[in-house]
């Protein structure tokens, strides 16, 4: 089972080598790593040229979503994954994902996510939960760094929405559920999100407003009973209330993760939990 990793890139030369090394240390026999770069002017291309196994292009694109879709179309693997430049995989992620996805009835697998700072200290553990259709219209339950999915999804023309710049991962996950693809949640961590202060997910009032608007677009795309107007302040407030009201349900889902894990019997050789990320865990030996 070949795994294709897609990395969208723009001026992240100081981090991208850790992402590349974290793919190499998986010790997985059949993989490809594709980097889609948006004409970076830092040292990104110098780093990429050090690794001849990487397939990469550096050309103008229309943003992260467009770069991802270009990479997905270039990919030749049976399983696809999306790793941002400033994040990295933990050891064992590929083998575990491949074992789970050997089930022909499954379409994707995702896990929890760890956060680390610039000093490699683990600062947060994000716990996900099993997939729920309606909840996916309000909350993103899949961390893109921790998601592996089968190529047939892209072959069926389900791609990342290019009109979204903050919630495209939420929209992609919701689209999979509403097209009845089967996803499996695992109580492990496949990857680490590096928090450096310039992340796209850093919260500001403007970005919060944009995420609400994009969330409304996702909601409108999949529900058949009501449409909200993202330009209407009352509708934006209504959507925000919906997110707040559903938080207790998310807490309940997370509380039942242990029960779900026992039911599904996916004890597939867990690797050690990392209390602290390190350069070794990102591939520097």
Language model features: what each stretch is:
Residues 1-24:
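N-proximal low-complexity "stem/linker" segments adjacent to membrane-targeting elements
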Residues 14-17, 42-50, 92:
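Acidic helix N-cap motif at the loop->helix transition within catalytic regions
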Residues 22, 29, 37-46, 60, ...:
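A conserved acidic beta->alpha catalytic loop
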Residues 59-75:
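Glycine-rich, basic loop-to-helix element that forms the pyrophosphate-binding segment
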Residues 80:
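Short aromatic/hydrophobic "clamp" motif used to bind/position activated sugar donors
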Residues 88, 92-123:
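Conserved donor NDP-sugar-binding/catalytic core segment of glycosyltransferases
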Residues 126-214:
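Conserved nucleotide-sugar donor-binding catalytic segment
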Residues 220-285:
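Membrane-proximal basic amphipathic "stem/tether" segments
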